[in-house]
Swiss-Prot record:
Changing A137S: Prevents G1 cell cycle arrest; reduced protein phosphorylation. Residues 315-318 are annotated as: MOAP1-binding. GO terms for molecular function: identical protein binding; small GTPase binding; zinc ion binding. The modification Omega-N-methylarginine is found at R36. One of its GO terms (cellular component) is spindle pole. This is Ras association domain-containing protein 1. Changing S135F: Prevents G1 cell cycle arrest; reduced protein phosphorylation. The gene is RASSF1. Gene3D superfamilies: 1.20.5.110, 3.30.60.20, Phosphatidylinositol 3-kinase Catalytic Subunit, Chain A, domain 1. Keywords: Acetylation, Cell cycle, Cytoplasm, Cytoskeleton, Metal-binding, Methylation, Microtubule, Nucleus, Phosphoprotein, Tumor suppressor, Zinc, Zinc-finger. SMART domains: C1, RA. Residues 198-292 form the Ras-associating domain. Potential tumor suppressor. Required for death receptor-dependent apoptosis. Mediates activation of STK3/MST2 and STK4/MST1 during Fas-induced apoptosis by preventing their dephosphorylation. When associated with MOAP1, promotes BAX conformational change and translocation to mitochondrial membranes in response to TNF and TNFSF10 stimulation. Isoform A interacts with CDC20, an activator of the anaphase-promoting complex, APC, resulting in the inhibition of APC activity and mitotic progression.
Length: 344
């Protein structure tokens, strides 16, 4: 991406609250591979996706379906994921959604990955992720030092109420596809500039892969939280996937190694930016899939939690039925062998 950076403005945002109610189940899903700068033939909606090699997802897979957008959860049947070795697809979906996947498996992509470690291997120089609390005078001094180091007009500004505003840059490194509202004309990144925002109820959706070099600058408040940054990015790209499918990471280069850390929902990216300074090597932000395997059950609504309990009970009953059937079959074969043996 070239030219002047496009900015996303985040001002006064709604206070943190419980996640919204679960979306209605998808009636019909359309999936298209959107190639940047090229038109797509709408008739491809009827063509099954090619190249995928779906396998059962791992036991730690707790994520959202790339087709219908619903949460994938279970103890035994967690879902399917594309495991094609020569591709970087990772398309993940429910078992029930497999037949509806129309998005072709993406070929090998240079995503610019670098080896990352989550903890320092040098015990003499531990990585400190804690951030100190600054006084108002220290914040003012930090802002002056920050503005003196940058070579652009993306300054930080101190407000009268003690808060401050500034800019953060987020790089999107998404392996899996994202979903946008389906329309007569397939969406593009340029369409995001004209969109009003994410809809609350989307029953038809189109999936595509975002370019690997997508970068966005956001103008945020010091109290803007990581979760709000994710939601703003999704609105800008018209993405209707659940924000909990994604996570914001901080990336740092130290001693020739790259360190990644997942930000908590309530962490304040601009505060981290101020403490680290303007250097991208000292700190940069990356949006990735939230594939840590951890589930924050408190973030789900009551209807969603009750639905998960029903799924768990149904899966437990099915698993018990299969076990009983297996042992019953084995017992029957042993009894048949006993009856076939001659007496004495």
């Amino acid at each position: 991406m070239s030219g002047e950076p496009e900015l996303i403005e985040l001002r006064e945002l709604a206070p943190a609250g419980r996640a919204g109610k679960g979306r209605t189940r998808l009636e019909r899903a359309n999936a298209l591979r959107i190639a940047r700068g090229t038109a797509c033939n709408p008739t491809r909606q009827l063509v099954p996706g090619r190249g995928h090699r779906f396998q059962p997802a791992g036991p730690a897979t707790h994520t959202w379906c790339d087709l219908c957008g619903d949460f994938i959860w279970g103890v035994v049947r967690k879902g399917l994921q594309c495991a094609r070795l020569s591709a970087d697809c990772k398309f993940t979906c429910h078992y029930r959604c497999r037949a509806l996947v129309c998005l072709d498996c993406c070929g090998p992509r240079d995503l610019g990955w670098e080896p990352a470690v989550e903890r320092d291997t040098n015990v003499d120089e531990p990585v400190e992720w804690e951030t100190p609390d600054l006084s108002q005078a220290e914040i003012e001094q930090k802002i002056k030092e920050y503005n003196a180091q940058i070579n652009s007009n993306l300054f930080m500004s101190l407000n009268k109420d003690g808060s401050y505003t500034g800019f953060i840059k987020v790089q999107l490194k998404l392996v899996r596809p994202v979903s946008v509202p389906s329309s007569k004309k397939p969406p593009s990144l340029q369409d995001a500039r004209r969109g009003p925002g994410r809809g609350t109820s989307v029953r038809r959706r189109t999936s595509f892969y975002l370019p690997k070099d997508a970068v966005k600058h956001l103008h945020v408040l010091s109290r803007t939280r990581a979760r709000e940054v994710i939601e703003a990015l999704l609105r800008k790209f018209l993405v209707v996937d659940d924000p909990r499918k994604f996570a914001l990471f901080e990336r740092a280069e130290r001693h020739g190694q790259v360190y990644l850390r997942k930000l908590l929902d309530d962490e304040q990216p601009l505060r981290l930016r101020l403490l680290a300074g303007p250097s991208d090597k000292a700190l940069s932000f990356v949006l990735k899939e939230n594939d840590s395997g951890e589930v924050n059950w408190d973030a789900f609504s009551m209807p969603e939690l009750h639905n998960f309990l029903r799924i768990l009970q149904r899966e437990e009953e099915e698993h018990l039925r299969q076990i009983l059937q297996k042992y019953s079959y084995c017992r029957q074969k042993i009894q048949e062998a006993l009856h076939a043996c001659p007496l004495g």
